[in-house]
Amino acid sequence: MQLWQLNPQARWRRTLKGGAALLPETAATVELDAEAFTAVSLLKTPLTARRLRHQLIAQFNRNFTLAETDILLRDLAAQGFLVESRAEQSASSVPGSASPGSQSHAPESVHLQLNNVCNLRCPSCYLGLHEDDRDLLSLARLCALIDECAEMGVFQLALGGGEALLSPKFAPVARYARQRGLVPNVTTNGWLITEKLLDEVQGSLGELRLSLNDAVTVNKALLEEKAALLRARRMRFGFNLIVTQRNLNRLSELLEWACAQGAATINLIRPKPAPGNDRWYTDNALTRADAARLLAVLKDMEPLFTQTALTVDCAFSFLFHGQSARQLESRGVAGCAMGERFATIKWNGDVYPCSHLHGEEFRAGSVLSESFRDIWERSQVFTKLRRDLPQVNGHCGGCAHNAFCKGCRAAMQQRTGDWLAADTDCPVPVAQAQTKALI
């Protein structure tokens, strides 16, 4: 009989809905419901499908067919999360492997702000930089944070700033994160990328994201040069692009250009209001009509994305309205997941549920005075947010798509003063009203 066990290289974490797994080498992830995650947790020792089925029946007191158990095992094996086993081996015996069930609920990704300074002054910036780069988070403290994240089961570390590459701690942090089994990624404006710097992080970064910003205040020739350096080293890279009123008419051209550079991914970002960028936001924010146009452009451009993956940030989840739960899950669409899948540690040690939330009422604690785990698990801010997030107001609250969207809470907080307000940019209510008018 065929025996299955966990891939020793896979990392696992609990989620509020079940669990998830990551293969650090490829950054491939999979989401599992509670039953599937329990099934996987039983594979810390090798089992056959038949034996696993018997244990699941005993645990959940319901019938599991051998066919559905076998399908689950073979599907996870095809994705690389399970491997065929010899009876004497156990995945949990592999040093450094994180097995399911060994952690409490943990964030999938932690955004770690290495500094608060930048060599550019982009009008779209949401951070409100203050040119304050005091060494509040020493390299030793950052490494201790990485240790905590690894022990909790965090998958990815999103390194940022400011401009992360200005920090002398960037390369050591990236290397140490990889050593601890996390996948460190970084977003940068690209100006400071050099051969020497790439030597220091070769083999450590999961992906380097070059910021196209809003494609107005960016030097495309510079980004082409940096992309060529990354291609020559076979380092995985992508682009971040803020989609705005001003560049929506050029979006097809920009996507074609980014694909031509050899990008592994292109991530489209929704404009977000923040202290200090009010004028830019007013001039560039997408209307509901713009959002509908964006969806049409993406559908037309779909054949382009054979070698390059196109992703959107969670604030654009309303673009997928109308798709089934299975389709949304397969695309990784989970909507606003601040405080559940993500958290931010700012340059001064303050912890927030989201990089785009500002204000003392959203400050969950400081890693200068307490552990990140304690903040994540016990902070009143996170507890209240997780309780209230499903209860968004207006059309968002009554939307059938709510579980996979919830709008952009940070944008609504800045715009209306109420983080639970209905998302005013969502095109779905207009489309529904137009449909009703035709009936």
Report each predicted region and the residues it spans.
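A C-terminal junction/extension of Radical SAM enzymes
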Residues: 1-3, 274-360, 390-393, 404
